[in-house]
Amino acid sequence: GKESIWIPAVAMYPNTTNGCADLAQVELSNGPEIKTLDFDKDSDENAQFAVAFPKSWNEGTVTFQAFFTADSTNTGTVSWALSGVAIADNDSCNTAFGTAVAPTAKAHSGTANDLDVTAESGAVTIAGSPSTDEEVYFQITRDVSADSLTADAKLLGIKIFFTTDAANDA
């Protein structure tokens, strides 16, 4: 069946080249403090993270939703794209990501620090030969050519959806 895994911004890191800003902690006047990775409005920026999927994963495509905010009253859209690559034991870590896939760009609400959640993306094909007992690296990108928010997009995390073909990992 369909399962999900939450990847918070605190589990991601900016790329060395064209990376987003380092993790920031935002203190709001009420409610939780939030931790974000801030992606610039002027150029595509990236962050990466890794997942070791359970043995019950069917080794197929994944989909995702991005959770983000902006400390702006702008109502522009934000476009997030995800790509992935599976690396097996004794494989080179220097392997290219698959094709990035983006859901429809999501408009910010126009209220500073409101939570925005994208629609679920189309299928993201993971490069390499995905299998269990492999590490899958992902790259999340703000694609500024496909969005219109004139402020930093503050990524809170993403939810990855994957399909299982077994009841457990036994």
Q: Which positions does each model-derived feature cover?
A:
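A short beta-strand element within beta-rich, extracytoplasmic domains
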Residues: G60-A70, V78, I158
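Solvent-exposed strand-to-loop "edge" motifs in beta-rich extracellular domains
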Residues: A52-S56, Q65-D71, V85-I87, T163
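Short beta-strands within extracellular/lumenal beta-sheet-rich domains
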Residues: K41-S56, T61
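Short coil-to-beta strand junction motifs in C2/discoidin
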Residues: N74-L82, D152-L155
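Cysteine-clustered segments with highest specificity for TGF-beta superfamily mature ligands
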Residues: L115-A146
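Proprotein-processing/basic-patch segments
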Residues: T141-A170
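Glycine-rich, low-complexity segments
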Residues: G1-P32, D89-L115, D165-A170
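Extracellular Ig-like/FN3 beta-sandwich strand-entry sites
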Residues: E59-T61, T75-T77, S131-E135
